């Protein structure tokens, strides 16, 4: 099977179709005109994963068709950044020439940045030894001498070898600010860097006249928290995943931001804490006094499942709500509750995933 054809000349057509679909989907609500934020038509995806196919002396990248499950060879991957595409053939050629590096390798993951750093994870169906580490170190040096700013990770069952760091440092331009973000391998990062910048700028614009404090649920590595910090007196943000919390703490320090506090707990537990249903030792240990915060704006960026009813009702207690959604279906369900108490004053489509049916939406609501 050959690689599916993706034609950048059709980019605007698919974006127009999404615009119409999202507008129609939310037509039952009183929404303002949809703001549409486009993606580059190609080389927009910051990360990519490929299986490795061994065929005699040859070795190459493959992907699998989602419907037929048939494999197809990938020598150039149009959605991926130029940085990934520039590295792919050089990496494959170098690995192909090393019995140690290619033996039982089955997958390669790339994580790139707009800042120029790239992280490559090489996955194996065997345990890795000192010989692998030595060859990988040589490979890393060779590629960096060719102009790449690259780190390598070797993974096998219950083991990981890191050369020399397991993260990249991304720099995003948000209006006149340059924000620094630590992005760790295997943790969530925004897949489309250019659109991520547009999302941050939109969020900053929506909240520029804010007063008081901001509460953010599901904050990840602090992606939005850091950009929004300048619009609020203080930001209190929650996140459950430990690697994301650690990255968020790093990012706060790297950007010299002193008004953001991250709490590691689930949105559901935080809802209970806010409503005084139970006390959480974690809050006491981190010296977080919820009563000292004057949060009249809340920011939510939930997983695809959306917010549960209890969290929706807690969110309704805030004057202003910003909701970023990767699943318009659950956003619509949540809006059925939120729109009873709040008006929708901003409505946006972010084309994070061109040429797919996936749509990222942003809604800003203010109390009626």
Curated annotation (Swiss-Prot):
<dbReference type="GO" id="GO:0005829">
    <property type="term" value="C:cytosol"/>
</dbReference>
<protein>
    <recommendedName>
        <fullName>tRNA/tmRNA (uracil-C(5))-methyltransferase</fullName>
        <ecNumber>2.1.1.-</ecNumber>
        <ecNumber>2.1.1.35</ecNumber>
    </recommendedName>
</protein>
<dbReference type="Pfam" id="PF05958">
    <property type="entry name" value="tRNA_U5-meth_tr"/>
</dbReference>
<keyword id="KW-0819">tRNA processing</keyword>
<feature type="binding site">
    <location>
        <position position="301"/>
    </location>
    <ligand>
        <name>S-adenosyl-L-methionine</name>
    </ligand>
</feature>
<dbReference type="InterPro" id="IPR030390">
    <property type="entry name" value="MeTrfase_TrmA_AS"/>
</dbReference>
<dbReference type="GO" id="GO:0030488">
    <property type="term" value="P:tRNA methylation"/>
</dbReference>
<dbReference type="InterPro" id="IPR010280">
    <property type="entry name" value="U5_MeTrfase_fam"/>
</dbReference>
<feature type="active site" description="Proton acceptor">
    <location>
        <position position="360"/>
    </location>
</feature>
<dbReference type="GO" id="GO:0019843">
    <property type="term" value="F:rRNA binding"/>
</dbReference>
<feature type="active site" description="Nucleophile">
    <location>
        <position position="326"/>
    </location>
</feature>
<dbReference type="InterPro" id="IPR011869">
    <property type="entry name" value="TrmA_MeTrfase"/>
</dbReference>
<feature type="binding site">
    <location>
        <position position="218"/>
    </location>
    <ligand>
        <name>S-adenosyl-L-methionine</name>
    </ligand>
</feature>
<keyword id="KW-0489">Methyltransferase</keyword>
<feature type="binding site">
    <location>
        <position position="239"/>
    </location>
    <ligand>
        <name>S-adenosyl-L-methionine</name>
    </ligand>
</feature>
<dbReference type="GO" id="GO:0030697">
    <property type="term" value="F:tRNA (uracil(54)-C5)-methyltransferase activity, S-adenosyl methionine-dependent"/>
</dbReference>
<comment type="function">
    <text>Dual-specificity methyltransferase that catalyzes the formation of 5-methyluridine at position 54 (m5U54) in all tRNAs, and that of position 341 (m5U341) in tmRNA (transfer-mRNA).</text>
</comment>
<feature type="binding site">
    <location>
        <position position="223"/>
    </location>
    <ligand>
        <name>S-adenosyl-L-methionine</name>
    </ligand>
</feature>
<dbReference type="GO" id="GO:0000049">
    <property type="term" value="F:tRNA binding"/>
</dbReference>
<keyword id="KW-0808">Transferase</keyword>
<feature type="binding site">
    <location>
        <position position="190"/>
    </location>
    <ligand>
        <name>S-adenosyl-L-methionine</name>
    </ligand>
</feature>
<dbReference type="InterPro" id="IPR030391">
    <property type="entry name" value="MeTrfase_TrmA_CS"/>
</dbReference>
<keyword id="KW-0949">S-adenosyl-L-methionine</keyword>
<comment type="similarity">
    <text>Belongs to the class I-like SAM-binding methyltransferase superfamily. RNA M5U methyltransferase family. TrmA subfamily.</text>
</comment>
<dbReference type="InterPro" id="IPR029063">
    <property type="entry name" value="SAM-dependent_MTases_sf"/>
</dbReference>
